[in-house]
Every structure is written in C-alpha cells, then in structure tokens.
Regions:
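Active-site loop-to-helix "anion-binding N-cap" substructures in soluble metabolic enzymes
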Residues: 1-440
Length: 440
C-alpha cells in the first residue's frame, strides 16, 4: 500500500485533525444494536488523542438527506426485498416504502447516541456538536483541547455532503490542519467529506487511518498476490450489481462460485428452467459471455446443481414457509429458488475447503429466514474450515450473515465496506483512497 498513514505523520501535538469515520451503525429506538463500526474506529482515534491531537470526528448515518430533500431513496435492504418480488408487484411495494419513509423523522438518525458510546469508550473526552458547520460545531471545535474529541452531527443532514458543495467543503476544511480518512465503508463515494475536501486542494495533508490501512493491506494484497488455489464466491440478488466484479475476478481466481439470486440468470443462460426465480433477462448474454470466458481461460465457474424452492417469497422475510428441493435447471414454472440445495452446499464447501485464498461477497439465499439460511451457513462454515487459507468476507450482507450466524471470529478478515469491497474486487480506484497523499 503506497498511501500515507497516521504513523507517517511524526508530530500530531496541537494539530487539528478531521477524521472521517463510518459510524453508520444500526439503531433501534435510539439504541445502538451493533457497535462494530465504532469499535473499528477506536485504534485511530486513540492514537491521535494519545499523541496530543485535537480530534474532530465526522460521519454519516443512514439517508436522512433523502427525506429532508423530499427525494426518498430506497435503502439496500428495501431494494433487496422489492427485487425479490414478482415484477408486477415491485412498483406498488416501492411506493409503499417511499410513503412510509416520508412520514419518518430524519432526526432519529442523529449521531448523539454514537457520541455517548464513544464517551464511555474513551473516558469522557468526547463532546457532541448538534450541527455540522453551524455555530455549535464551530464553538466546540474552537474549544477542543489536545487529546480531546468533538463528534459533529450527521453529515447527511446537509444535502451539500453528497453534492460535493465547495462552500460546505471549505467550512469542513476550516476545522483542520490534517485530514484522516478511516471510513472504508464510504471510500467508494466521492462526497464532500470522503474526497472533495482534499480534491479541491483545501487540505494539503491527507492520510488514512488504521482501519483503511488494514482493509487495503489484507484485501488488495490477497487480490494481487493470492496463494493458490484461489476461490472467489459471489452471491446476492442481482447480476447487474456485480458485472465488473465477475469479469475482474475471473482474471485472478482459479474457481468462481456463483450462488444467490444472481445464479438464476446464469442458469437460464445455460438453457435451464428457473420458474419465477429472480432473473435479469438483459444480462443473459453477459452471463453467456462470462461462462465462455471462463472456459477459454481454463477457469472453473461453478453454479448450483440443486435448489431450495418455494411458491412465494416469505412475507415477512422470516415467516415460516414450505419448501422442496429440485435440480437447479428444473424449477417448476410457478416456483422460485431462494437458496442452494444440499448437493450444491457439499460441492461448494469441498471446493472452498481445498483453497488457499477465499474471497466471499453475497449470501447464497435469503439467509434472514432460518428455513433459507442453510446455503449461506454452509459457505460460512467452509470458510471457517479452510485450514491455512486466507479467508476474506467482503462486507455487506455476507458480513451480516457471518455475524448473525456466529462465524465472525473464524475468518481472516471481514471487511467494513460492502460497496467499497465490491469496487475493490472490481479493480476500481476508490475516490476516498485515491485523494490521500502518496508515500514518498
């Protein structure tokens, strides 16, 4: 990794440091339900405080901007549920989500609970600012002493954050002498606080924190210098979300395993009958192209050989349902595939266990439903059983599945960034990384 890190700066004492964190943690009734992202940010924050910096923390939380601006954007979770519905039902479901979102109070996405938790973890050295660039933030930043922290309010309470507004960037830049990005989860976003404040030349010294350093070291090195056999596993709902990832990983891996909803487009491309399973008909030709590419390169591309099917998508998502198992290319016309079957679980697991490098992004089925979680559990277990292998879980739903199923401590690395991991797997340059200073 050729980017400067916090350890490359020799004198932090008295320096004002703006640290972009990812505190977008799940909340229920104002209570944090998973604090892993907060814990992940602590090494950088503690290092800066211990070295006498005046630390200004900033982050987003959810998508309040869409409600405040009256342009509601679907969350990934909502989009996933809608995509799994029959096409005729999707528009009505989308409108129902939008109407519900418009009635919500965006202020429930305040970062104040995060500030309280940080205070508990850092010994009452964190002050919460009730705005981002307003008078409260300005006063608290000005009063911040060496070895103390100020956490700004949710950046996305300002539309200017995502629009890279120059004046907003200037106000953020006025808080600091040095910028630190430690939010890998948003490193693929080119927003005011993730990249533009440096791109506009407003802050000259910009380095990465320990969290981003770890992400880049583990994931980038495994992609560029993998031990073989190298097995990549892709799941999730849509082929369209992973076009570039499929293509790039085929160049690097020995075996590419395709599961989840995206597998049915590949199966249909092979002439299979997939019933009402999720299919992206516009990507059929692309799937054929990728299968031919794998064949031409001598790479192995594995698809499910059997599938767990049901008549309707569970509603709610964890509702009890009746299922059966059929060959993956013989799904009845009125049925849909929602998980990989037992023969596929064994096939995939054996391939994973024999690997020396494994990268996984995307669940094998609707793991939120216990009846449809067996495929995802089998993959997680296989990663845990892959002796001597480097095993990497690429954030998002895969990371959630690992945590939910109890495998988080049994793999080499779980990324903190879903979208950022995907773009790294795709070989893209991440704006939040590219803007940082290179090492001499």
């Amino acid at each position: 990794m050729n980017k400067m890190t916090v350890k490359d700066i020799k004198d932090w004492k008295g320096k004002r440091v703006l640290v972009r964190c990812d505190f977008n943690v799940p909340m229920k009734d104002g209570v944090i339900t998973d604090e892993n992202r907060i814990i992940g940010a602590l090494p950088t924050i503690k290092y800066l405080m211990e070295h006498g910096a005046k630390v200004i923390l900033c982050s987003h939380m959810g998508k309040p901007h869409s409600i405040l601006s009256d342009e509601v954007k679907l969350t990934k979770k909502d989009q996933k549920k809608i995509d799994a519905l029959p096409e005729a039902e999707r528009e009505a479901a989308k409108q129902a989500v939008i109407e519900k979102a418009k009635k919500e109070d965006p202020k429930k996405l305040t970062l104040e609970p995060v500030a309280k938790r940080l205070n508990e973890l850092l010994g009452d050295k964190v002050t919460f600012a009730h705005d981002v660039v307003g008078p409260d933030a300005q006063a608290k930043v000005a009063a911040c002493k060496e070895g103390e922290c100020v956490l700004l309010e949710n950046l996305r309470f300002h539309w200017e954050e995502e629009k890279k507004d120059l004046e907003f960037c200037k106000k953020l830049a006025a808080y600091c002498d040095i910028y630190v990005n430690d939010a890998f989860g948003t490193a693929h976003r080119s927003h005011a606080s993730t990249a533009a404040i440096v791109e506009y030349g407003l802050v000259k010294t910009a380095v990465c924190g320990f969290l981003i350093e770890k992400e880049l070291t583990v994931m980038a090195d495994s992609l560029e210098h993998p031990n073989h056999p190298f097995v990549a596993i892709l799941g999730g709902a849509k082929v369209a979300d992973k076009l570039g990832v499929i293509n790039n990983l085929l160049e690097k891996c020995d075996t590419l395993i395709i599961g989840g909803g995206m597998a049915y487009t590949f199966l249909k491309a092979e002439g299979g009958s997939v019933g009402t399973s999720l299919v992206d008909d516009e990507k059929i030709d692309y799937c054929k192209e990728m299968m031919q590419k794998a064949k031409d390169m001598g790479k192995e591309l594995l698809l499910p050989i059997d599938t767990v099917i049901t008549k309707d998508f569970p509603d709610p998502i964890d509702a009890p349902i009746e299922t059966s198992v059929v060959a993956s290319k013989e799904i009845p016309a009125d049925m849909m595939g929602l998980d990989i079957g037992p023969k596929t679980r064994e096939l995939f697991a054996n391939k994973i266990k024999s690997a020396k490098t494994v990268i996984w992004n995307g669940p094998m089925g609707v793991f939120e439903n216990p009846i449809l979680a067996a495929g995802t559990i089998a993959v997680a277990q296989a990663l845990a059983d892959a002796q001597g292998a480097t095993t990497i879980v690429g954030g998002g739903d895969s990371a959630a599945a690992c945590a939910q199923l109890g495998f988080a401590d049994k793999v080499t690395h779980i990324s903190t960034g879903g979208g950022a991991s995907l773009e790294l797997f795709e070989g893209k340059v991440l704006p939040g990384i590219a803007c940082l200073n290179d090492k001499n």
